[in-house]
Amino acid sequence: MKTYLQSALNRTNFSFQTGTKVLRVRRDGGVATGVDVQTNGASSSHSICIKKGGMVISSAGALLSPQLLMWSGIGEAETLKNLSKNGHVTVPSQEWINNTAVGNGVFDNPNTFIELYSDEIASYSYSYSNPPPSDVELYLNNRSGPYTFASQTSAFWDYIEQGDDVVGCQGTIDSAGAMDLLENGTITLNVYGTSGLRSVGRVNLDARGIALPNSNFYSDPRDAAAIATFVHNIFQALPHTLTPLNIAKNSTLEQISTWLTTPSAYTRGNVQHWSSSCRMESCVDANTKVIGMQNLFVIDASIVPPLTTNPVMGVMIAAERAVERILALGK
């Protein structure tokens, strides 16, 4: 908002419109000719056409970009058939681009909350609606105090080797407890599985044609084993003054793995870091052009594989490179 958008707003050939929902890409075979949009919540839609030689780029995200492609007649054949029955796909069936890779492999980081307690710790809970006056004064007058940073005060990573494979894991520390473990002296260790995980899902559409992701956590038991190893290694390094509250510090690898995969308020959580649902070489090519199309591109988290760290920066880097490659196509 402060960088890319501000630069774009200064361009004479840029138009910015809010309250707009793109339903589908209009196309003539493999050529995108425009988009159908709804504005300001209207039930009806209208079309916006592009000039000859123009392009359409979807940056709707790892859930809605696959939905947009499916509504445009690009995706798994059975899904397109169902969408067509409901009037969502308007492209004739002979022009459908059947590609099961659209929406496949969607990924989110499985998230685990481990509550740690020490009587040497003073927890700090952030309240942006009613912060302590002394902390407000510190921030407003001196740009100091706890509100100069987020509640997650540290982050760390490790790689777990499994034969020839390597699985990435991330840990962060939050300044207070979570769920029903909120006693002063409690902090939260968040554990995420990241790159190299094998358990992925698919972006499916409900009866209304709306994207509903399936994270499919721990469908491959090796993923639970990798994250359990990460947790076990952390427990071995904890000082004697720091005690896990919702799982025993002396738990075995097998016990940790079972706990991780058992649904609870502290395990199997989504962090909404959705990615990887329109992957390169199967859904888009190296220029992020949708396979089977001449001028339709996808630039967002759906083209990025699972990353070791928070995916935001990785998505930005991939997007900048994608723009360079797309611009080069027109030269």
Q: Where does each model-flagged region fall?
A:
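Conserved redox-cofactor binding core of oxidoreductases
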Residues: 1-32
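N-linked glycosylation sites
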Residues: 10-13, 82, 98, 142, ...
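Loop/turn elements at helix/coil->beta-strand transitions in domains of secreted/extracellular proteins
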Residues: 12-15, 31, 52-55, 293-296
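Structural recognition of the beta-strand scaffold that forms the well-ordered cores
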Residues: 16, 34, 56-59, 70, ...
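Glycine-rich loop(s) and the adjacent beta-strand/alpha-helix scaffold that form part
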Residues: 25, 36-144
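Short, solvent-exposed loop/turn segments at the edges of secondary structure
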Residues: 30-32, 101, 107-111, 117-118, ...
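FAD-dependent oxidoreductase catalytic-site/capping-region signature
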Residues: 144-331
